[in-house]
């Protein structure tokens, strides 16, 4: 049961409490500042990137996908599957467009017509 307005006036319900695990108002420190503050002089690996300089590339190239060593038959099979999925997406999209058109252009409207495009 709801309380009357007079009973609710003195008790704010949605105000956060100050001691509920919220951090203090001190600004957060960067990772480099904490290292310098503790006395360690450790150079970060990405030091050049935050100064506007490009980071050094790694000496060995990384393989981004294991698909480089596929048989041509597997590639053709994958392409066929992608084509099948695109056709299915196209059919479902057309189905939704048709349903939307029917809803907007039906003669029995339970709601006012919206003239948005």
Swiss-Prot record:
One Pfam short name: BEX
Basic and acidic residues bias: start-end ranges: 41-82
Any coiled-coil regions, as ranges: 73-100
Region span, Disordered: 1-82
Gene Ontology CC terms: nucleus
Alphabetical UniProt keywords: Coiled coil, Nucleus, Transcription, Transcription regulation
Subcellular localization: Nucleus
Entry annotated with the keyword Signal: no
Primary localization class, coarse: nucleus
InterPro entries listed in its UniProt record: TF_A-like/BEX
Record function comment: May be involved in transcriptional regulation.
Family recorded in the similarity comment: Belongs to the TFS-II family. TFA subfamily.
Protein name: Transcription elongation factor A protein-like 8
Organism for this UniProt entry: Mus musculus
